[in-house]
């Protein structure tokens, strides 16, 4: 067996990686006899022994072999599955903080058990991250019997849980959770006004399932907590009708490119399909201004503050019409415009594009235009997971991105060989000039295969293409199923039958990841169809046993026909997505076949490889309607994909450089929040901040007279309190500072005595945190604007990142000062009297939403009410007709109670 482990490995690095694990694997195999003799009740006792050893100073490495042996035997007893040697090797790599690449059907979920169990013994918690709630719940329930036998607790966090349940689940030894929920919980924890309401504990160790999807595909989509904001939604309707009046700039007839010189551009705007960007020309802005004025939408110049937003509205309208298409980037359902994930093919329920793009698409599709949102907190997945002491991951496709994993995350990829040799035949790509010829060829190939009885899976890049092929199959009399975002409710049924004889399935990327297509069909699904769901577990197991003979007959028949035939209808930008589609065939040593059909009209070819391939095909003597299959062409396609992957890597690296600036600032703000939450003497903190600010204002006076700037500032801070000093212009600056500090301390002491120390400290904490949150939200918006501004400076040969870092630091320094000053001003100017001795701050619940944001300025909004993100009320609620706490003299309902 040990020799067989090495033989299938590809490449010298893989062999070296595997060779390093063999001595440990041998020792684990030798220990298996010891574990076999244990009674069930001994497992939890052995776990306690291992925990005691760790507390006594032993290391995880010294107990690793016993822990892996125990968990392997626990899996055999509870799941009737003994982890293969390759799965043990995978577990060892996961423990070391590496990424394992395992092919479909090789048991990644079971491979994670050993590493999770070992690392849970420290008591610091293990997080296992999945891509959706279904997998989190499924995997936790599936592995729970194993962990129960071992005596470690296991939990799961789902999107519908409140914070009390979340906190309880995160406290377990091992917790399953989605990447989105983990990120949102981190952001929500850092918006809380009570330490006891925080859900998470310190980030220790996490195992990320489908790590390439989360850390690469979703790396351009930062998580965001947002709240509603008022916006001019009518403007999107107004500009939507103007799209046809503006014209794209003319391109060179030979090269297909725009003129290099700006003065030579003839038209209103240019389109960058690769970056999904629209740019107005000077002529275009003039035409837009005339258009808006003639339609009565604006009056006067486009460049006034009140009118210039229409450039943004129009840009988004053009994007909506020219770069985002129905049944490709999104669908229109009962709930309006719904985004389709380009990598998974699934609907991103409740999420919205940002920056007005979603509103522009809604206007285009003539559905209700919703309000925009404002950012309250944000983090990228890169920086979320870099906070863990140790991370590792699993996927079927990681080796193509090994360079990025190493450079960004310092993670190595270990390619784990299959337990059985891969028998799938991967054929050279077949290439056509046009999409029409390609689709006809696919239909012919599927028809022949269908008649033979061999199951076929046809992968498409969009809903639109899946519907075109479906119509063509229908015309040829090919019975088939279509799996896309529009009929996802039938997914389980379609996938269960996709490996049966004569099965033909057209699917978007939904079938490319996480689906297990079994030859002959799915026996459990077949039994459910026969006996229904209203039966006992014993009856179901008996029915499965009785059906097994028929199933094995069907399995062997499909196997003899060549297994599952996977046809890709075009190449994706990423080789990983293509490999995921191919990976549906040839599971666990089964036979299979795969081939990609490509045309020069496909997006990848058109944008990244069209000219070179067209030239090469011409040299090979290819006519318009003829296909061609050649290793040179396949190599050219792969090179095009590599160029796109390198480009996307640079984009993600670029995003990370920007986000690192925000990360340092966010970490500082969150550390300040935590310090304030724990502080029992915030009055002293505020007085120290005031003294520092006064010293800053008095720098350079050297004890002389004060400046007008200083006088203006202290008037804003102290207001009515300065009356006792009389004329202050001639007071020595140092004496004035001492007097002001004396006034401030007396002011705060009086209020503290009036309502009590604890209550006053709670009020000060609330005011400080409220100021931090509000100002930081404004700061995030300012950073977004700054980023747009520095992007344009690249045209002036300036480095945008350097400019962003330098100016970002300056506005952050201003933010810190502003938070302190506004808090000082607020608490000093608050008037309390004896009639409001039971004054308390108002607990305000915030209507916030969780969002996702794509690199190209696209923000995806997960539109759900996060009720557990709230400001904590530290005092009883003020009556609506009572005087407002701000001292304005107005009733609360007519002042701060309006909102």
From Swiss-Prot:
Cofactor(s), names only, from the UniProt record: Zn(2+)
SUPFAM superfamilies linked to this entry: Helical scaffold and wing domains of SecA, P-loop containing nucleoside triphosphate hydrolases, Pre-protein crosslinking domain of SecA
Top-level taxon of the source organism: Bacteria
Keywords annotated in UniProt: ATP-binding, Cell inner membrane, Cell membrane, Cytoplasm, Membrane, Metal-binding, Nucleotide-binding, Protein transport, Translocase, Translocation, Transport, Zinc
Coiled coil region boundaries: none
Subcellular location(s) of the protein: Cell inner membrane; Cytoplasm
BP term (GO), one: protein targeting
Pfam families assigned to the protein according to its UniProt record, in alphabetical order: P-loop_SecA (PF21090), SEC-C (PF02810), SecA_DEAD (PF07517), SecA_PP_bind (PF01043), SecA_SW (PF07516)
Protein's UniProt keywords contain Cell division: no
Catalytic activity: ATP + H2O + cellular proteinSide 1 = ADP + phosphate + cellular proteinSide 2
Transmembrane segments: none
GO cellular component: cell envelope Sec protein transport complex; cytosol; plasma membrane
Subunit: Monomer and homodimer. Part of the essential Sec protein translocation apparatus which comprises SecA, SecYEG and auxiliary proteins SecDF. Other proteins may also be involved.
PANTHER family the record matches: CHLOROPLAST PROTEIN-TRANSPORTING ATPASE (PTHR30612:SF0), SECA INNER MEMBRANE COMPONENT OF SEC PROTEIN SECRETION SYSTEM (PTHR30612)
Purpose of the protein: Part of the Sec protein translocase complex. Interacts with the SecYEG preprotein conducting channel. Has a central role in coupling the hydrolysis of ATP to the transfer of proteins into and across the cell membrane, serving as an ATP-driven molecular motor driving the stepwise translocation of polypeptide chains across the membrane.
Stated name of the protein: Protein translocase subunit SecA
Species: Borrelia garinii subsp. bavariensis (strain ATCC BAA-2496 / DSM 23469 / PBi)
Organism classification: Bacteria, Pseudomonadati, Spirochaetota, Spirochaetia, Spirochaetales
């Amino acid at each position: 067996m040990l020799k067989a482990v090495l033989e299938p490995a590809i490449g010298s690095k893989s062999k070296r990686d595997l060779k390093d694990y063999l001595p440990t694997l041998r020792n684990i195999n030798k220990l298996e006899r010891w574990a076999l003799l244990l009674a069930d009740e001994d497992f939890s006792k052995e776990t306690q022994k291992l925990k005691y050893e760790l507390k006594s100073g032993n290391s995880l490495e010294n107990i690793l072999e016993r822990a892996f042996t125990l968990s392997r035997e626990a899996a055999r007893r509870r799941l009737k599955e003994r982890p293969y040697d390759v799965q043990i090797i995978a577990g060892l790599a996961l423990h070391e903080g590496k990424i394992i690449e395992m092919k479909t059907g090789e048991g990644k979920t079971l491979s994670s058990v050993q590493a999770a169990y070992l690392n849970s013994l420290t008591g610091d918690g293990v997080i296992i991250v999945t891509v959706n709630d279904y997998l989190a719940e499924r995997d936790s329930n599936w592995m729970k019997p194993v962990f129960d036998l071992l005596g470690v607790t296991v939990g799961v966090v789902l999107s519908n849980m409140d914070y009390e349940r979340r906190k309880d689940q995160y406290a377990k030894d091992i917790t399953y959770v989605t990447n989105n929920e983990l990120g949102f919980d981190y952001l929500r924890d850092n918006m809380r006004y009570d330490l006891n309401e925080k859900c998470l504990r310190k980030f220790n160790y996490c195992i990320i399932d489908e790590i390439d999807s989360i850390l690469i595909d979703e790396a351009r989509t930062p998580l965001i907590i947002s709240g509603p904001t008022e916006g001019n939604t009518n403007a999107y309707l107004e500009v939507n009708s103007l799209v046809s009046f503006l014209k794209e700039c003319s391109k060179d007839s030979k090269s297909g490119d725009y003129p290099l010189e700006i003065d030579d551009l003839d038209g209103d705007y240019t389109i960058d399909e690769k970056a999904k960007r629209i740019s107005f020309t000077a002529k275009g802005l003039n035409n837009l201004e005339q258009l808006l004025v003639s339609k009565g939408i604006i009056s006067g110049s486009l460049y006034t503050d009140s009118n210039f937003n229409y450039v943004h509205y129009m840009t988004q309208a053009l994007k909506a019409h020219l770069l985002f298409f129905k049944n490709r980037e999104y669908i229109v359902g009962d709930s309006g415009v719904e985004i389709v994930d380009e990598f998974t093919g699934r609907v991103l329920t409740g999420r919205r594009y940002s920056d007005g793009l979603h509103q522009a698409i809604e206007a285009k599709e003539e559905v209700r235009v919703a309000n925009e949102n404002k950012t309250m907190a944000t983090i990228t997945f890169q920086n979320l997971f870099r906070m863990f002491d140790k991370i590792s991951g699993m996927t079927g496709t990681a080796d193509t991105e090994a360079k990025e994993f190493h450079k960004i995350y310092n993670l190595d990829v270990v390619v784990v060989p299959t337990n059985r040799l891969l028998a799938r035949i991967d054929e050279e790509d077949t290439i056509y000039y046009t999409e029409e010829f390609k689709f006809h060829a696919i239909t012919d190939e599927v028809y022949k295969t269908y008649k033979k009885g061999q199951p076929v899976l046809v992968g498409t890049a969009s809903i639109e293409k899946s519907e075109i092929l479906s119509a063509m199959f229908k015309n040829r009399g090919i019975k088939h199923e279509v799996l896309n975002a529009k009929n996802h409710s039938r997914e389980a049924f379609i996938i269960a039958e996709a490996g049966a004889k004569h099965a033909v399935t057209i699917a978007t990327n939904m079938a490319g990841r996480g689906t297990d297509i079994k030859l002959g069909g799915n026996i459990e699904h077949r039994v459910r169809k026969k006996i229904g769901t209203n039966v006992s577990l014993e009856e179901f197991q008996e029915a499965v046993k009785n059906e097994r003979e028929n199933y094995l007959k069907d399995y062997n028949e499909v196997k003899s026909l060549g297994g599952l035939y996977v046809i890709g209808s075009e190449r994706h930008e990423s080789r990983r997505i293509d490999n995921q589609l191919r990976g549906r065939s040839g599971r666990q040593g089964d036979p299979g076949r795969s081939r990609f059909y490509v045309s020069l009209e496909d997006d990848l070819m058109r944008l990244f490889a069209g000219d070179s391939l067209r030239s090469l095909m011409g040299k090979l003597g290819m006519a318009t309607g003829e296909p061609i299959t050649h290793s040179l062409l396949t190599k050219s396609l792969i090179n095009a994909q590599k160029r796109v992957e390198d480009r996307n890597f640079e984009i993600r690296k670029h995003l990370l450089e920007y986000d690192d600036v925000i990360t340092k600032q966010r970490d500082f703000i969150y550390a300040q929040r935590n310090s304030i939450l724990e502080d029992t003497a915030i009055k002293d903190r505020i007085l120290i901040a005031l003294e520092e600010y006064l010293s800053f204002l008095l720098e350079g006076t050297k004890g002389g007279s004060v400046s007008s700037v200083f006088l203006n500032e202290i008037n804003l801070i102290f207001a009515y309190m300065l009356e006792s000093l009389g004329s202050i212009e001639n007071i020595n600056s140092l004496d004035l500072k001492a007097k002001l500090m004396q006034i401030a301390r007396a002011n705060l002491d009086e209020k503290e005595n009036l309502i009590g120390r604890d209550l006053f400290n709670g009020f000060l904490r609330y005011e400080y945190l409220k100021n931090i949150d509000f100002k930081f939200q404004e700061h995030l918006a300012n950073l977004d604007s700054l980023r747009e501004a520095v992007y344009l400076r690249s045209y002036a040969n300036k480095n945008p990142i350097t400019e962003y870092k330098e100016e970002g630091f300056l506005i952050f320094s201003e933010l810190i000062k502003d938070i302190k000053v506004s808090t000082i001003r607020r608490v000093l100017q608050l008037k309390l009297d004896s009639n409001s001795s039971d004054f308390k701050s108002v607990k305000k619940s915030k209507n916030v939403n969780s969002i996702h944001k794509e690199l190209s300025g696209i923000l995806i909004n997960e539109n759900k009410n996060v009720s557990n993100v709230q400001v904590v009320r530290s005092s009883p609620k003020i009556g609506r007709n009572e005087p407002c706490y701000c001292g304005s003299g107005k009733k609360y309902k007519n002042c701060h109670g309006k909102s």
